[in-house]
Amino acid sequence: MAPKTNLQISVICASNQNRSMEAHNVLKNAGYQVDSFGTGSAVRLPGPSIDKPNIYQFGYPYDEIYKELEAQDSRLYTANGLLKMLDRNRRIKRAPCRWQDQDSIYNIVITCEERCYDAICEDLYRRGETLNRPVYLINVDIKDNHEEASVGGKAILDLVNKLTEAQDKLEELFPSIMADFQSNHPKLPVLYTIHFF
């Protein structure tokens, strides 16, 4: 049964590949309407060596990235989990999207890394507060690997469930929800604030 909420939810990491897409998948499977984005200048994925990443533009389809990396070195990208991740991603949406290139309005924005949180803060300041609509901006710091993304995705679902339960009193209950979340997930440091669209 889908959660009863009117909250517009967005999850964000640097490249809209691992952490944000894991959270997107978990939230979507729980019945939430959710979007996901990256904040970087390009999509960066591990390559054959640390100094040779695979770089793509936002909007380039996950399916095409999958096919290119499979042709490049199927064994390497299967062993490091990249093909499995891209397969999941292409089942969720067409392509990675960049936060700064969209103009939708969200009630809850959850980032997975402090530099992404900072980028969203800067973007919201740049846009201005013309609509006077609050956005609850939260950073759940998740290491960028498959295992931590899985743990983080479940924790984000827990957080979104709590925020949804309190949606009618969110402004009042937001600080205590965040304090409870931090004590229940001590290995996932959080930052949070309220901005306005």
Swiss-Prot record:
Pfam families: Ssu72 (PF04722)
One Gene Ontology cellular component annotation held by this UniProt entry: cytosol
Keywords: Cytoplasm, Hydrolase, mRNA processing, Nucleus, Protein phosphatase
The reaction(s) this protein catalyses: O-phospho-L-seryl-[protein] + H2O = L-seryl-[protein] + phosphate; O-phospho-L-threonyl-[protein] + H2O = L-threonyl-[protein] + phosphate
InterPro entries, A to Z: RNA_pol_II_suA (IPR006811)
Leader sequence residues: none
Task performed by this protein: Component of the cleavage and polyadenylation factor (CPF) complex, which plays a key role in polyadenylation-dependent pre-mRNA 3'-end formation and cooperates with cleavage factors including the CFIA complex and NAB4/CFIB. Ssu72 is required for 3'-end formation of snoRNAs.
Protein name: RNA polymerase II subunit A C-terminal domain phosphatase ssu72
Gene field: ssu72
